[in-house]
């Protein structure tokens, strides 16, 4: 079994662009 490489530096999480699904689907505005 190939060994998994351990990341030496902390992995940065990829930020997803903010998508407001709630507004699109429900059409309800959040206060």
From Swiss-Prot:
The keyword Transcription does not apply. GO terms for cellular component: nucleosome; nucleus. Keywords: Chromosome, Developmental protein, Differentiation, DNA condensation, DNA-binding, Nucleosome core, Nucleus, Spermatogenesis. It comes from the Eukaryota. Testis. It comes from Oncorhynchus mykiss (Rainbow trout). This is Protamine CIII. The keyword Nucleus applies. Protamines substitute for histones in the chromatin of sperm during the haploid phase of spermatogenesis. They compact sperm DNA into a highly condensed, stable and inactive complex. It is found in: Nucleus; Chromosome. One of its GO terms (molecular function) is DNA binding. GO terms for biological process: cell differentiation; chromosome condensation; spermatogenesis. Residues 1-31 are annotated as: Disordered. The protamine CIII/PPC 6B sequence is shown.
């Amino acid at each position: 079994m190939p060994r998994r490489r351990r990341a030496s530096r902390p992995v940065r999480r990829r930020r997803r662009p903010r998508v407001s699904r709630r507004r699109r689907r429900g059409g309800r505005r959040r206060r």
